[in-house]
Amino acid sequence: MSVHGRDPKKRQLRLISVAFKEASIDSPSFRASVNFFQTRVDALEDWIEKTVDFFDQKYKVSFEDFRRAKETLLSQLLPPPALLSNGFVSNQSFTPRLIDSFNKDYYDFSMKLLQIVKGDDSSHSTALLELMTTAIEPYRNVRKNFDFYQGKYDSMLASYQAIRISKTSLEPSSIKSDALQLFEVQKNYLKASLDLISAISAVKLSLDKFILESMKVLKSRSIFITKDSGRKIDLSPCINEYLDNYAIWVENSIEGSKVLDSDISNAKKQAYRYTLKRITPSSDTSDYNIRSIHSSKLLSKDTQVPPKSPEKSGWLYMKTQVGKPTREIWVRRWCFLKNAVFGMFLLSPSKTYVEETDKFGVFLTNVRYDPEEDRKFCFEVKIFGNKVTEAHDNMSKDITLVFQTSNYLDLKSWLIAFEATKKYVMSIQHDSLEYELAFKRFSPKFFEFASSTTTSIDQLITTFDKETESLYETLNCSISEYDILTLGEEKVFQFQMPTTPISTKMTQLAILSNFLTKGSWFPNAVLANIWGTTDWSEYTILPGKGKKPSSLLTIDGKRLPIRNSTIYPQYYSNELKVLDLQFKSLVFSPDQRLEKLPEELLLFKFEALWCPNKKQKFSATCFCTKDYIYCYMNSMEFICLTKISLSEIVSVEADRSSKKTLKLYDASGLQMKAIVLFSDYKLIASKLQYLLENKAIKNPNSNEEILVKFEQMEKESQEKKQEELYKIEQENSFDRKATSVSKIIKSRVTFWEMSDDASTLLNRLKKLQTEYSITYNHEYEISSKGLAHILFGDKSNAFPKCLFLARKDGEEHGKRFWYKNKDINGKSQLVRKIPFRLDMTGNFLNTGKYHRDKESKMIFATQRIVKIVDNKYYEVDLDPFFVKVPFCHLLKLSIKFVITESYDVDNHLEIKLNMTASSSSLHVLYKLEYIDSRTGKTIEKLSLAEIICQTWALKFAHSEFLLIRRVLRYYLEKIGKHGKVIKAIKLCGILGVLSNKSEEPATEKNGNSKESESMQYDIRYSCTILFLVFIKLMVYRVTNLTFVFFRILIGILLLCAEKFSRINRMMVVGLLASIMINILLSEKASVPYWSIKRAEKLFHDRLGSDKFTMQRAIYISDSDLLSSQLSVPSNNPIFEKFSEDNFNKDYQYSETRKQLAMRRNELLIELRILQDMEKQLVHDDYEKFLLEEVNKCSMVSIEMTDLWFNDTQLQNYCSICNEELEKLRPPIT
């Protein structure tokens, strides 16, 4: 499917290769189709040979004789000029010369006509030679290879199966060896079969190309060019249109086939690999030991009931007898077990189509392993007689069938399939179709497809009952030349029969046979000649659900009729009947789960090239019904079935940039593209657009009305083909478009239509506005009809979402239909009830679940359509709500919705009756009244509380109107800009009327009960809720004032920032740079300052206080601790000896030494302080000097490595600098 812009998987094409699948399993359908195609090739070559012989031996000779006779005739048409040249005519001067010129010119004209008739045999021969060399000859080579391996495989298989197990020399190893040899031949046969399918596809497309080129050659000779003016005259203009279509189809098909080359190759490889896995012989030698096979090993007693009916199919050899006297032979039959039915297919005597035998329910059979048979891997199927089946009188005896499989595993699988099927049938319901099928026997539906083989067993298992018919007699048809089916006096090809997945001699008859049948629950020969033997049920498409019926039992419970003629209505033409049979055969019949074919009638079909993307193009046949477009695609043996629901399409447009191209758009804007061929693409677009419009209205037209409309369209299309002026065509297309739009707008989706003019409606609206308290209105870019469907359609969720007091999270939203009701005056109205849960505070109090249980009671909003003028005016009332508020009378709240077309004074609505306006106005009117709960009278004088309450109610009404606008904006954004009315109808539903009165809401009966009693309120506000509302409003006001203050403050700051941003930026940058530099310099100068400051502070702390006296005596030995420069070294032995000898003498000078020591302490402290001060003065400079030296050393060590390593003195100097620098830096603690 063509997909542009969204979700490629949603429209992804699902291609299947029916031909490759049938070739991989070597089915009878495959063999019949390739044999029938060979007969077509032989017929084509015979036609070519006969045509060439006729052209060379008869046509050329006859043409030359005719040309000479023609020249003789032309020379004698007029008297010779010489005869008239001697006074024989009056105009002696010009008549003889005029005759001579006329004879020459007329001769040239005649020769041109003869050349057109003769044709260009050289160009035609070139196209024919290309066909033979590029398609026919390669096909012949592939076919020769196929015939060789098919014959070899069939003969080896027959020999392999014919081995007698009674031979004493038969060993499992020899059987295994034969099986492996057969497998090697089967692999070559499989490859040849797949290659043959590809070759057949190439021949088909090449033949189309040859026919196109031949037509072009013949058409080119029909162009006559005048001698005098050189003007070209087309002698056959009617050929141009369909020849151009054919050329487009051939060119695109060839281009598409090249794109599919890789897919074809992958499909062949996949089929080859899968089949090899399936047919590979077992490597276990015990599987070939015939004498070890026992029934107990083949069937397990613990076989479980399968979840669905088992399926099994394949070739088996069947034992039968022929001739008189009878002799035993073994023949191949394609056997199948499906849906609890066992049956057989076989090739016809001509081997060009598939035939069938009777089908038997599994409970009419008894299956067992047959060890008595002198062949390997045999089993017996015993079919019971009419003890169970009373419908077949010629079945009086039981029939015993003996089948032979090719290997042990295949034998086991067949026996298990029968056993599992019986268990499955017994586990299902006994009134189901599958259960009934298991006990029935079915004869072939038609004589033409029944087995015509004369063997004894085939005749026993092929019977006919009163339901078996002859298609030739019933349909009045026959097979004519080239095996073409003739229906009455018309050839079937005149009904545009499409290419089926499988083509056999009886394919066209099989398609027509669907006229006499309605589906099948099991395989049959009709389906095998169209779709092959494979079950493609999972790939089919149906219009609705419920593919599997529960029961098909008839009244007597014994008969299951499987034939039922299709009954077409009287208005359905014969051509449409044949097209409908094609449609159902290609689209629905492959589904073997169907009780009967869907009863959808085909309305028209068209051929197209379906374009899923920019590269791929598939040849497609599109079948259109009232509700769907079904597409059957067949390109290079790839089949695809898909459908498009018309309910998903909103518009069909002809692509102006590409001729013959249609674009289909769905509601989301998804685009599908198709190139329409062999039909007027504008006519197809008109038909599809009409079906879309018909689908959108409330009461769609019937098939008969649609076909009548299509006939009118076709007649108009034929008339328009005669028109050549572009201006007239444009006007007609505009009129057609206007008419189409008018029909959409005038479709009656309500049950009545009124016709008031615009001024009356406008005056009515003005009068209503004076009667209501307040009116809110808003303009929308959509027609009034579309807006009405958005708000009041039965699928719209606008209500109760638009109601101010409705819970927005309620689960009551759903379809709410309108139903007829009568008002007080007896007039009909449309009424509906919308349930919703009440939420009295949720829209203005964030109180969470406060009083949620009490506030969430279920109430109903009743809407009544008061007046409708379709497409112009819609008036809907909402029944009043009664609200009870403390200290106030009962408040009655009435709401009216009015939708009108936008009124323009310059363009009155009555002059645009056939066109809908592009915009409309929504008016919401509110009326608030206080009434006496007892009398129901309106209160005129309001109290202060009632005035305040009314003010609040009007404020909340405005909030509700804003909510309505928000909901409408959501729907309009979802609808988009195009096709608004149709999208609104599809999205939001229609103003539908219930046909069943029992579906009316039960609350309608109770709706008027409160009118008869005293006035009751719907909504009650308690004092607590009002208090919360008051507190909430106060908080809201305070919060607003706070936010206003902060807003002003932020505004001032922003203003200052704006003013500051206008200052010179360079000045700001300079100031910032100056500040940074000053910070760095002050940091550098502050370090020594604060060091001295700390020293001074320490000094004053130590000595500056008068209240603190510190005395310390420092002796010679103590002074060594402070300074080694002011005393004798401590390790001086002479001084030590002196100290020991004079120790006693020192005591008498102790006082004097003490004073000296104290003085010494003072002097040392002062000296140390001075030393530190002096050191601090030079510390920074010295550190800076050391840093520079260290940097220089580092630079020399990096940039002058030779100098650095050779100069040890420099290295020592640098190391000393590093050490000194480390000493100056304080240690890290």
Swiss-Prot record:
Major localization listed first in the record, in broad terms: endoplasmic reticulum
GO aspect biological process, one term: intracellular sterol transport
Carbohydrate-modified residues: N1206
Gene3D superfamilies for the chain: Arfaptin homology (AH) domain/BAR domain (1.20.1270.60), Pleckstrin-homology domain (PH domain)/Phosphotyrosine-binding domain (PTB) (2.30.29.30)
Residues on Lumenal side: 1088-1229
Signal peptide: none
Subcellular location: Endoplasmic reticulum membrane
Free-text note regarding domains: The VASt domain bind sterols.
Record's subunit section: Interacts with SNF1.
Stated name of the protein: Membrane-anchored lipid-binding protein SIP3
